[in-house]
Amino acid sequence: MDEPPSKKSRADSDYDSGLDALSALESLEAFPTSSKDTDVDNNPSTSAGGSGGPSGSTPHPQGTPQPAPSNNGGFNLQPGQSQPQQPPQNMGGGVNGSVLQELLMNPSQTSNNSPRPQAYPPGQQNAFNRSPMMPNGTPNMMSPPSMGRVPGPSPGGPQPPGPGQPQMRPGQPGMFQGDQQQQMMMGAQGQQFPGMMHRYPYAQGGPPPGAQGMPQGYPGVSRGGPTPGQPMGRGAMMNGAMPRSGPMPTQGRPGIPPNQQAMMQPMMTDRQFMQHGQYGQQRPEFMQQYGRPGGYPMMHQGMMMDSNGQPIRGPNQMMMMSNGHPGMSHGPPNGQPGPQAAAAQHAAQQQAAAQAQAQAAAQQQQQQQREQEAAAAAQRNGAGRATTPGSSMLATHQDPEKRKLIQQQLVLLLHAHKCSQREKENRDFAAKNQPPPHAACTLPHCSTMKEVLTHMTSCNVGRLCHSDTTQTTKKCSVAHCASSRQIIAHWKNCSREDCPVCKPLKRIQDTPLQFSLPDLANLIGVNGNSNGSAEGDGLHQFGSPAMRTGNITNSLFEGFNGNPFQNGPNRGGPRPPGGNGEIPNLPPPDMPDCTKEWHHQVTKDLRNHLVGKLVKAIFPEPNQEAMNDNRLKDLIAYARKVEKEMFESANDREEYYHLLAEKIYKIQKELQEKKNSRLNQGAAAHDQYAIPPSNELAQMLGVEGGRSDVHSEGSSMAVAPSQQNQPWGGAPNSNMHQQIPPNGQVPQVNNSSTFPSSGNSTPNIGASSTVSAMLQPKTEPMDDQNTDSLSSRPPTAIGFGGSSSSTPAPIMNGIVKKEEDPEESSNQAPPSVKDTKDGVAESKPKEQQAKREPTPPPTEDTVFSQEDLIKFLLPVWEKLDKSEDAAPFRVPVDAKLLNIPDYHEIIKRPMDLETVHKKLYAGQYQNAGQFCDDIWLMLDNAWLYNRKNSKVYKYGLKLSEMFVSEMDPVMKSMGYCCAKKLAFTPLSLFCYGAAMCTIAREQQYWVFEQSSTQYNVTVTERYTYCQKCFDALPPEGISLSENPNDRNNMAPKTSFTEQKNSVIDYEPFERCKYCMRKWHRICALHDKKVYPEGFICECCRTAKKYQKPDNKYLASKLPHNKLSTFLEDRVNGFIKKQLQAEAHKYPVIIRTLCVQDKEAEVKAQMKQKYVESNQFPEKFPYRTKAVFAFEIIDGVEVCFFGLHVQEYGSACPAPNARRVYIAYLDSVHFFQPRELRTDVYHELLLGYLDYAKMLGYTMAHIWACPPSEGDDYIFHCHPPEQKIPKPKRLQDWYKKMLEKGVQEGSVVEFKDIYKQARDDNLTTPTQLPYFEGDFWPNVIEDCIREASNEEAQRKVKEDDDDGEDADGGLGGGDSGKKKSSKNKKNNLKKNAKMNKKKAGSITGNEVADKLYSQFEKHKEVFFTIRLVSLQNEPAVLAKPISDPDGLMQSDMMDGRDTFLTKAREEHWEFSSLRRAKYSTLCLAYSLHETDSKGMEYTCNKCSSPAVWHCQSCDDFDLCDGCKPTTQHPHEMEKIKSLIGGGEAGDSAAGGTRYESIQRCIASLVHACQCRDANCRRMSCHKMKRVVQHTKMCKKRINGTCPVCKQLIALCCYHAKHCTRDACTVPFCMNIRQKLAEQKRSQQRRADMMMRRRMEGLQSHVGGAAPTPSTVSNGTPSNAPTPPVSAGPGPAVKGGGVGQVQMQQHQGSHVGGSGPAGMGQPMNSFGGMPGMGLGPNAQNGPGLPGMNPQMNANQSRYMPNGPGLGQSGAPGQQQQPMYSSGMPMQRPGGLGGMNPQQQPQQQQGHPGLQNPGGRPGGVHGMGQNQPVRNNQDMVMNMQMQNQHQQPPPFDSTLQPQIMKINSRLKAAKTEEERETVFSDLKKTPHLFHAWLRMRENQNLVPNRMQGYSQMSMGSSNLQNLQQQQLQQQQAGAMRGGGGFAPGQNNSQPRAPSGQFASMNPSMQQQYPQQQQGWPQQRQQNPGGMQQNANPYNQFQNRQNMMMMPQQQQPHPSNAGGQ
């Protein structure tokens, strides 16, 4: 061939001047001749069908009368003559007769005569065929369809003998001249052409047609000749040779060209062929010698027969080609002879004898000729490639003049059609009073051809009309009609690369001609209703509407071979925008929201063209009438929307084509599914005629060129020659499978147009009833199936015009299960033409498991044969079916039998094992993925309908496990990743209402969300509430301010929306770009940003020996700095030391990902109290760093450790100077080897502390708090098997690490925070380090607020007392004396109270005293680490800290929240190693690319810095290198990045980019402040211009201006660090305000999460081993201390918090007797340092032996929130835990307390275990045994009195309770009060909270009285002991400072986590409590325990009434009071 086929252009490009083509034809040279073809007929056939059936030559009987001459429209031919008797008449338009006239009038005898001997036997397998339309005939101008359109095996090799190869087809007149044989129109080896010729059955007996004087195997008449035995039109001839026929019938109509009569008569006749007795011979296929039944089995159905004699479904109605070819028609019922039959009988009898004589010789010569042609074909096409039908057609010695005439007529036809369209457009414009867009055509003969085309659209002559069967003998009298059909048919069907007729036009098409057929359907196929077929007949073409999609439907130029300009010689040409059949008059397509570089290569016309393809994929007949239908308008709007989405989402033009074509294909597939289901139902009754699948037939399947019921005619898939040679065949269930050709290779795609050429070969369907079903067109534009396709099909990929598809696309016809996966399309992009040789030739590896070829269409999964699928899948199915758990799944669910009428309402798509088995054997599965989908559908249905505790549900779980275990190996063996149905972990939802409340799955919840973005800063507010907490909210909603009492910024309840926590996201899929197998994206470890070339599965990669592409975005390629280098060397050194030679297997990569400077702002209360008085700094500058560690596992990087730290340098003011704070630390347990995992973590942390020590930092701080339930610190979704450590275990972990640090010298010492405060003599909050995000700043805020409230309450109380004193002084006499005495007592009491209070506070600062109580409560959680010894500290302090590492910008790693949020959005989970690998891949890519956005633009082509920006497009930029080579329709303006000195690629250097930004910011600041017009700084003038431009720019608002975008990004950088109040930089103040708002929003959420964590921690508070500084009893710190009186306890782990599982909240104390169980001391109000009242105190009441009634009440009230008066820290409200079997029903679903808690709690209470080990300086005093006994008595007494303790109270309900109280106070009548109570009772939890509030207020005075009574009964021994301890109590009780402060710990909280002011009614109790507590402290420290945390327990009214009785039986326990 002269040119590679992939570079052939299509002829449907625009063509403006037909003369250009003609002039090009004039210069063509004749093709070289071939000697072996000299005896071959080179004249064209005149069959209107375009690809007729086989022809065989048969001598005519010599005695046959010849027709008389007549003038028939330009031809006057007489029988027996080879020359016309008169010249042709001139026809309209100036053309002298038909273009074929000269060929017909001057035939070449040598070329017209058949060399086959007269007696050639017809029974050979390879019928002799010299028709110019046949593949083994002469290489004439009209090639028949390729083998892809012809049933039967390829002609490339010998064919097996047998009855499957009929020699000739009956019912077609041959073409013969003189005494020569009649030429028969046959396919290769006698194949018939089902696309063009109908199969006519023989009668039930007698000789075959033409048995007299004809060979016995004469199968019928060829195109253009009369039926033997039928009268032939006078003068009719074929190929210039006069046939000798029998008597001339009277039916021949004068005025019709005889050649057209003969040509059209047999083709357009729908009668049974030769049904009278004269034709008793059966069709050869059904003769006994062929092994067929004696009778024709389907004559009554009018069946067609294929080349194997198998029945082919024929149309029930008139079978008209979509191009108007009358090739297929249906006959009348059996037994109804045609009107010509009687006259034809006699002629057939006369021909029978001559035919018999010539039969033997004909067969012999036919065999010889077949061998010669096979050799010639092999020589031309090369070994190993199947010969295409058209490759041996045309004789290269044909007369160039004749060839030119044919070419001229073809060009004229093409031009005339285009010209007609232009005229129509001109008329349309004229109707609108608009100037015509096209000039008038001046081409000669154009009008003539337009008349011919117009006539052909409505020409019914010679075709069956159901109302007039006599039309079968009519002849068309219009000139050029038949010849034009013939030429068009040849052009359409010719697939030869060296065709002398087509090749010149191919060359012309290689140049960009303006030649197209945009709307040929409007002229011929749609508006004209091609061939006169009534619209009502519903039969525009043989196939489904899906086949017609995208092409010119029902046009003259497309029959079963599809678009002639696509399917013919121009298949390979690029498809221009105006291509074929777009919807006319579409408005310009919508511009994309973001413009990309490749967008400018796609014109609007092309986009509209593709929109039309989408429309026609759904509604294939958009005629002008339908264009006015609103449904079609909606459909077009949908198509435009889809096209726009694809246009925007695609990364390049190829992907855009790929996405659109994938969409089209899936739409077509869905349409076909419904039709095929009907076909299969209809075929069931006729299975005896179906062809079973076989290897031979399998090779005939999957033909690209073949017409299928699946493909649209324009569905953009490439065509391979060998594919065209494989016709469809087989039964309805087998015609969906493809097989590999004999050579096992994918033939090179020679079609650069990636839409397939729809061929003329239809599936051989073995039951006639299915034909009618298949022929029913689906023209409804929006039926159910179509609607589903619109909504359920994601875009997938096929290439469109201009590019060669890398995947040769076979056609699949079968029921394909709808794919439910929501995957986006793969990155399959058809390679360019230059890549065709490399990419396409290897587009499919040879599969061992499932041999198949060629590759399926894009996004259609690999297609396996039915046998292979059964072999692989049946064993899995059998195991499932035999399982005991499969009982409910074996048969379909019978809703009536099971009495479940709602089953089908809930389950929309039932599935069961029996149905799966049937579909498997019916061939309805094309791949294993569809089988898996059905199994999972079956299981999902069971899980959806049945409850979790039902047997069916559990059976489904077990069956799913079995299925995965059995199916996974099978899927892997078939080339897939796995058989699992994988979904991402559902996100945990937190309730912002009650503490520790979570929103469970499938629960309803309410959410408030608002977001605003300005200046590139986005502020998002999102608050979620469970149903119960939402109901408890007041109508005004929640406060969005930091101060919860601020009512100015509220989110009302009406702004909340109700949602359900039921969202499940499934893992997306990627498709292999070659075999289209679906892999989970995470299994494939593929991200299209990292690997833009597309995904290649391991199967194809192995077969093709492709190396996995390099990942440019590895973590190891991120920049190093000093810190990361230091840590990496240390860790790898440690691993090497431990593993020696194995260390290289476990390389660790450590990188510092972010280094930024920030400031920690002081909170409001602290600022008001201390900052304004200059006692405390307002801000603390610090540097934050993010350090992450990676390990290479299985060759892939996996991130396993993350660390965020804050460094407060030497320039930071005290108390933060030279301190480092470990803010967050997180890990996932994927590090290998496992035994070194903990040590490596320790090395990382100790390495950082050592590094900080070397820099000059002196102290480090760690908060050892596990995350709360469902919370993550750094990594999203930890592995389920990785248990989040419980508090004690985590603290032990840190302690072990720090002890190791002490040993190695990196740590000097470490203490708990309480010990550190005592040692540092902390007397004011200003001495406590103040870290960003730490726990203590919030605690200080609360302490200050509480102290202020208490002071206000005291003043109110004093004022009240003073008022009473003043009132008492008014009386006289005795009463006055009594009052005076009373006042004196009150004053003395008040003074004593104040003095005692001061004596109890050693700091003299109420806030500090409260802090100390919190310190002791949480001392186990906070570590203070000294890095530098006190001796070396002065030397260290003398040197300022200088960080050797520069700043490193990273928005994603700027704190933990950004990365965590992005991971949740993108599903970057670390829940398994598989997902961790993928998440790390995406993380590393984002880290590489994070710095390349915002500041400068990047080139859309190469991603380098862009300097050219499109003014029209939203986002299109080019660099200098790409601009010359990239065409863009808009004007480009040159821009420069505002950042000088830094390139985008320098982001890896970190510092370089930062320095560039800083220089640019400095220039910006200077320019905004500079007033010098002649400033000598160059950057000044540049920045001034930029600033001025931004102020005036109108495009700045929508973000389309590149200059403004850069400036705003630069201003954001500046604003993050700007502190000037009057900054002149544009937008600085606005951006800072927005940043502050963003920070506040983030801080509120952070406070909420911290409160949750601390509340979870406090639920197990004290469950931690003391640090070494507080352990002095010699017990190992990691060993639990047994209870006091219960003996040694089990070695159990401490409680934990934060797991998604609930076990960390399930705690119950270890058993024991009541007193022993109560040995856990109750916490004091303020924590009471020195009293051994550790953090465990809150848990005491819930111990064994408590009143069951109290337990019940507690469990009843617990859901409403925490109790009051606990710990005093935000979120420290603690709930009592029980061991009584009644778990604590917190909203989070928490259970009882873990038994492991008790030892931990007791360790935290040295007062119970080791008197000398008390913290706070108490140890050493040595409490004696009586004191301990006293403590036990007090605890016993406490157990009796614990019911008197007030119930816990949910502080979040405080505002509502206050509102209720106000309503009660305002109520004046009893009815009003009842109304209030009635409303209150509607919300039970609020009613209970109100009751508890009342009980709390009433209980405290009673308890104070009880304590006073008990104190009076104390023993002298106890008094003596208390006197001895008074001195130490004064020091040990410093943290108490007055115990009242500790009570006000539970206050109403807003979502921000802040605490509101205390209710005054609550505050009134503190003075009362303070009156009694100091005396008790002095008397009995142990007695304090009985009163500890009085608000921690619930007390009902009955228990309150029983208080005196409870106290009386235990007088001994009251000692010490």
From Swiss-Prot:
Keyword Transmembrane helix recorded: no
What subcellular compartments does it reside in? Nucleus
Residues the entry annotates as binding acetyl-CoA: L1225, D1226, S1227, R1237, T1238, I1284, R1289, W1293
Task: Select a single GO molecular function from the record's annotations and give it.
Answer: chromatin DNA binding
Question: GO terms for biological process?
Answer: embryo development ending in birth or egg hatching; intrinsic apoptotic signaling pathway in response to DNA damage; positive regulation of apoptotic process; positive regulation of transcription by RNA polymerase II; regulation of distal tip cell migration; regulation of DNA-templated transcription; regulation of neuron projection development; spermatogenesis
Q: Which residues carry this modification: Symmetric dimethylarginine?
A: R234
GO CC entries: cytoplasm; histone acetyltransferase complex; nucleus; transcription regulator complex; transcription repressor complex
Q: What is its EC number?
A: 2.3.1.48
Chain residue ranges for the region called Disordered: 1-182, 307-398, 558-593, 706-864, 1349-1401, 1656-1828, 1908-2017
Amino acid composition bias (Polar residues), ranges on this chain: 106-116, 721-773, 1667-1678, 1748-1757, 1943-1962
Q: Which residues bind Zn(2+) 2?
A: C1510, C1513, H1528, H1530
Comp. bias intervals (Basic residues): 1378-1399
Can you give the residue ranges of the CBP/p300-type HAT domain? 1112-1492
> Composition bias, kind Pro residues: at what positions?
152-164
Question: Can you tell me which residues bind Zn(2+) 1?
Answer: C1499, C1502, C1519, C1522
Keyword list (alphabetical) reads: Activator, Acyltransferase, Apoptosis, Bromodomain, Chromatin regulator, Metal-binding, Methylation, Nucleus, Repeat, Transcription, Transcription regulation, Transferase, Zinc, Zinc-finger
Report the function annotation for this chain.
Acetyltransferase enzyme. Acetylates histones, giving a specific tag for transcriptional activation. May prevent DNA damage-induced apoptosis by inhibiting cep-1-dependent transcription activation of the programmed cell death activator egl-1. In differentiated cells, negatively regulates localization of heterochromatin to the nuclear periphery. Plays a role in migration of gonadal distal tip cells, where it probably modulates expression of genes involved in integrin-mediated adhesion.
Q: How does it assemble?
A: Interacts (via N-terminus domain and HAT domain) with prmt-5; the interaction results in methylation of cbp-1. Interacts (via HAT domain) with cep-1; cep-1 transcriptional activity may be inhibited by interaction with methylated cbp-1. Component of a complex that contains prmt-5 and cbp-1.
Protein name, per record: Protein cbp-1
In its UniProt entry, the species of origin is given as: Caenorhabditis elegans
